[in-house]
Regions:
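Divalent metal-coordination and catalytic microenvironments
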Residues: 37, 73, 105, 150, ...
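Alpha-helical multi-pass membrane helix bundles of inner-membrane/thylakoid proteins
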Residues: 57, 158-216, 276-283, 308-330, ...
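C-terminal regulatory/interaction regions
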Residues: 2-28, 233-243, 259, 263-359
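Membrane helix-loop-helix hairpins that form the core translocation module of multi-pass transporters
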Residues: 24-42, 96-184
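Hydrophobic alpha-helical membrane-insertion segments
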Residues: 96-112, 251, 255, 287-304
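Juxtamembrane transmembrane-helix termini in multi-pass membrane transport proteins
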Residues: 43-128, 227-247, 269-274
């Protein structure tokens, strides 16, 4: 009996977990985020034991704050939002897009921080600004993120065109709600949508975003990476216990996964609701799809401009300007835009007859 129950359990809760009820998948995802927090602050607890270095509390909290700060970078927000939009348009309710992306993204700094704790001094040099390793990894990360966001942005732009044209008749309105956005694509950039579906078909489940997140992370923001590694080295020299030092990358990961998971779940709710109601919510669906597409194309342009500037050693004003743009915390502005759009349509929906009860 044990030989059959184990594969069944593995298939049910690992390979086929996308078939579980949404509430269960959300619960598993949030439980994983909670486990990361328990691990991070469990490691921190070793530094708070009698006679331990009190500096540990400050450095772990600093690492946690760095993880939260980095989760609101525009490329994070845009990648998670546009990927969520893709899955929802395919009839899925993706509960773990943000978690998988941030877990893969933070794995780079987690591995680097762990090697620093283990005494691998070459790691700090590899990430040093201007080093060959830093240059190559930065190009890989920028290339992957730029191309992925470009493809997603064009795909969602094609959906936006389809939605805009689909609003002309009641028949097309019902087709969007019944069959998802894919049916409406053919009314707009049908060829573009079909061409872009091919590469995007490789991303079939939210967990596959983990690999993309890791590749994005290879071009990790230099200041964030160096800052965390220097924090780890400094804390090590100050006598902070090794277990507490390991809490730094784990705390960084815990904070990033928390913020990105909540972002992914929030966008899933927004997009899913937009596809279930007529009138106001369908207009809301079209609006947020346009915002997602524009944000992805905007970030892709900046990222790829900087990529070609560094790869080819270009010195023209255009790519030089793009390479120098620091989006910083612009992701917070994008979240604010989505929130304002939602509030606007929520308010309008409450004022329209027959929509107050469903909003």
């Amino acid at each position: 009996m044990s030989t059959t129950s184990h594969p069944t359990f593995y298939r049910r809760y690992v390979t086929d977990r996308h078939t579980l009820p949404l509430r269960a998948r959300v619960g598993f995802t949030l439980a994983a985020v909670a486990a990361l927090h328990l691990l991070a602050f469990g490691l921190l607890a070793t530094a708070l034991a009698p006679g331990a270095q009190p500096l540990a509390l400050g450095v772990v909290l600093a690492a946690y704050a760095a993880g939260m700060k980095h989760s609101y970078d525009w490329d994070h927000i845009s990648a998670i939002d546009n990927t969520t939009r893709k899955f929802v348009s395919e009839g899925m309710n993706p509960a773990s897009v943000g978690f998988a992306f941030s877990l893969g993204h933070s794995l780079v700094v987690t591995l680097a921080g762990t090697m620093v704790v283990a005494g691998a001094q070459f790691v700090s040099g590899a990430f040093e600004d201007g080093s060959s390793a830093n240059h190559v990894l930065g190009l890989i990360g920028a290339g992957v993120s730029g191309v992925y966001l470009l493809v997603l942005g064009l795909y969602n732009a094609s959906i936006s065109v389809g939605l805009a044209r689909g609003r002309s008749t009641a028949h097309q309105h019902s087709a969007v709600g019944a069959r998802g956005d894919g049916a409406a694509d053919d009314g707009g950039w049908g060829l573009v949508s079909r061409l872009l579906r091919k590469p995007l078909q490789r991303v079939r489940r939210p967990r596959e975003i983990f690999v993309l997140g890791f590749l994005f992370g290879l071009g990790f923001d230099t200041a964030t990476t160096i800052g965390l590694l220097l924090l780890t080295v400094s804390a090590s020299l100050a006598g902070v216990p090794a277990l507490a030092l390991l809490g730094l990358p784990v705390a960084f990961t815990a904070a990033m996964t928390l913020c990105d998971t909540l972002n992914g779940l929030g966008m899933m709710k927004l997009y899913s609701n937009a596809l279930t109601q007529a009138g106001t919510r369908r207009r809301f669906n079209a609006t947020v799809t346009v915002i997602s597409a524009v944000s992805a194309l905007f970030v892709a342009t900046i990222t790829l401009g900087g990529f070609f500037h560094d790869l080819l050693g270009l010195e023209d004003p255009a790519t030089t300007a793009l390479a120098e743009i620091d989006l910083g915390q612009a992701g917070l502005a994008l979240i604010a835009v989505f929130a304002l759009v939602w509030l606007r349509f929520w308010w309008v929906g409450r004022r329209e007859p027959g929509t107050a009860s469903s909003t």
